[in-house]
Amino acid sequence: MIPIRSSITRILPNGFLSKPFLRQLNKKSKPNPHKNKNFDSFNEVFIHKTLLSSIKQHNDTDYVRCSIFNANGDMIQHGKEILKSQFIKRYNLTPRDFRKFNWQRSATGTTTTSSSSSSSAGQTSSGTSKSSSSSSSSSSPHSTISALSLSNSSLGSSTNVDIVPNITIRRNSILVQLLNIRALINHDQLIIFDNSSSFQNSHVSSYTHSQCLKDLSQRLKSTNLDGLPFEFKALEGILIYIVSNLNMEMKVHNTVLQNIITGLEDSIDRNKLRYLLIESKKIHQFHRKITLIKNCLEDLLENDDELNDLYITEKFNSEGDGQPRQGTNHEEIEMLLENYYQTIDEIVQIVENLKNQIKTTEDLINVVLDSNRNQLMLLGLKFSTGLLSMGVALYVSALYGMNLENFIEEIDGGFEVVTVVSTIALIALLLFSVKQLKKVEKVTMTSLNDQRK
């Protein structure tokens, strides 16, 4: 509390502050060195743990997590983490080959770093008894920053989806990136990279990844494809998985769209139109995705050199000759790719039909809404016509009811004459207006041509 004397004498007559008031302000603003010391120590620990977390995040990105199948279709390694430099050296790759593969650090490392930094910050802040309140207030921004980094990492991993497919051929391997499949195919190994690192979709992505690994293992163990090289078996297994997923997604979109269109046939409301808009966006995204996959296979089929380079086993067996495979004798891989290219092309055609259905539905909805709008406008014009006719009758009656002398009052039957005249004028104007409205309502192409002439 400021004393009464200082509160009274704080402002002098000349407009300056008094000395007692200045001393009071200096006393209030005097810093507490013990409190600042504790706060600085907490900031140092917080910055130190943040730097450690960033260093750990950088180190986690140097590892590649993958599952490896051998030539017999058996999974010899599952979820193994390998240094990226060792992986590149082992399979004769280049660092630019991994630009398409956006590696994310694991969720376990993130939670461990956050928990360790928060626990150490709590221990440091509880070291002194006088800084308990400051430690609680300081730990809240720490937890907020951890939560923000956690949400940003999960958001980045969930939205980090490469929509551009790619099949890259190297000297002794094939790099495949189609949908959520990122794989490396060798002459005797199939390597599937694990890129599921989202907290929100961890269960769904892990289940999908396990199903993919199971399907690929069964496909590689199939005895019906013993005549094909291993790289063709692996590539066909990946294409089968991709096509089945595309076909399933296409059926889901088709079912949802047909239900929406059926509902719009009964009634048109705001919610159904919103569902139609959302489904239209999803179908457009799906169409763009499968079109890119189709173009990827088409470009591969049109290049004979790349088709020859797909024979990894043959190049490995004849590596001592030093002669690359040439010519157009690549019927096996060409027939394999053409089969799935045609299947994907059929899916593209079906999706284009769905887009045409959406376009037709939108046009019909616009026509119906325009027709309803025209009906409302005509109804408003009819009411306006009736009010106009009634206004003429009211005008005549108003003239007759004025408090002025006129000859009609002296004539017998003047009231009847005014009533009949106003009624006739009302009916005549109403009939004329209705006739003009009918002409406006019955607009045809021939009438438009007549008006132009």
Swiss-Prot record:
Residues annotated as transmembrane: 376-396, 414-434
GO terms under biological process: mitochondrial magnesium ion transmembrane transport
GO cellular-component term (any): mitochondrial inner membrane
Chain residue ranges for the region called Disordered: 108-141
Major place of residence: mitochondrion
Motif segment (YGMN): 400-403
GO molecular function: magnesium ion transmembrane transporter activity
Claim: Membrane is one of the keywords in the record: yes
Gene3D superfamilies according to UniProt: 2.40.128.330, Magnesium transport protein CorA, transmembrane region
Name listed for the protein in its UniProt record: Mitochondrial inner membrane magnesium transporter LPE10
Organism this protein belongs to: Candida albicans (strain SC5314 / ATCC MYA-2876)
